[in-house]
Regions:
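Oxyanion-hole/transition-state-stabilizing segment in secreted/luminal serine hydrolases
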Residues: 108-152
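Substrate-gating cap/lid alpha-helix
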Residues: 185-221
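Histidine-centered active-site loop/cap adjacent to the catalytic His
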Residues: 236-272
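Bacterial signal peptide processing site
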Residues: 20-23
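Active-site segments of SGNH/GDSL-like serine hydrolases
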Residues: 165-198
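Structural recognition of the beta-strand scaffold that forms the well-ordered cores
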Residues: 53-57, 92-97, 123-128, 176-181, ...
């Protein structure tokens, strides 16, 4: 390289070195610029929509028996309505309820690994249980009806219901449990059963107390729906609701889900 070329190269190098030094002197250390504040920016609730897994437990009411429109009773109706809630894009339902199931049979069902897996994965649980426990006593004492057998059975039912809640909570401590009360199907046959009406009221009180003690559950009363509309809400078996009866239950469930704060609980699941 010639002498002139060396001079040009040296001058060019000095210029680059000087520029680099200027940039270094003016630049903030990287460690001082790492914190970026997003405190004023909030993610909209529906920015990442939630897929909700809803599980049904219990007896024929949750199964939807008697619904001549085949719309899945109150369970599928309410589940469909949940897609309209903020932050929920899709609802997956898993109905594990079965016609005729009693509380002792539900206790046994909850011991099955596949059922436990479904409960662990649930975001929301609907349950009806107890009607068949009462019917068992009714059938056994049909021609000598007295109140004592119903209250003896109630003692066992309360213990089993507590066991059911305990099992579900051990598997899933967060999902709200929504449980309805019982109604009196005898009213459509005769109005001379005031003692039986008292029995239903006391059983409902036991259910409501258990639900309240859980702290993350919602009791939905439905007894009055069938008292006021007995001539139009029953299926032809005079025991299960028909489609209109399930429509009324749907409305009642939605009202109490809001009152119990279930949307806020589910939103909390979304935010976590």
């Amino acid at each position: 390289m010639g002498r002139r070329a060396w001079v040009v190269f040296l001058a060019f190098s000095l210029v680059l070195t000087g520029c680099d030094q200027v940039f270094r002197n003016n630049a903030e250390p990287f460690t001082e610029r790492r914190d970026v504040q997003f405190n004023d920016w909030e993610v909209p609730p529906d920015f990442l929509p939630m897929n909700l897994h809803v599980v049904g437990l219990g007896d024929s009411l949750t199964q939807g028996v008697g619904d001549e429109l085949k719309k899945g009773g109150y369970f599928e109706r309410v589940a469909s309505d949940l897609t309209e809630w903020e932050g929920i894009s899709f609802v997956e339902t898993e109905n594990l309820a079965k016609r005729g199931r009693r509380s002792d049979q539900l206790v046994e069902q909850l011991e099955k690994p596949e059922i436990q897996a479904s409960i662990k994965d649930a975001d929301l649980i609907f349950m009806t249980i107890g009607g068949n426990d009462i019917m068992k006593v009714l059938k056994a004492n049909l021609f000598k009806l007295k109140t004592a057998p119903f209250y003896k059975e109630l003692e066992g039912y309360e213990k089993r219901l507590n066991e059911i809640f305990g099992t579900v909570r051990a598997l899933n401590p967060d999902a709200p449990i929504v449980m309805s009360g019982l109604y009196n199907p005898m009213l459509i046959i005769t109005d001379e059963v005031k003692e039986f009406e008292t029995i239903i009221t006391d059983w409902n009180q036991a259910i409501e107390t258990t639900v309240a003690l859980d702290g993350n559950s919602c009791f939905v009363p439905v007894k009055d729906l069938f008292e006021e509309n007995a001539n139009v809400v029953y299926h032809t078996d005079f025991f299960h609701p028909n489609a209109q009866g399930y429509d009324l239950m749907e409305e009642r469930y939605l009202k109490y889900l809001e009152a119990c704060g279930v949307p806020e609980v589910l939103q909390g699941e979304l935010d976590r």
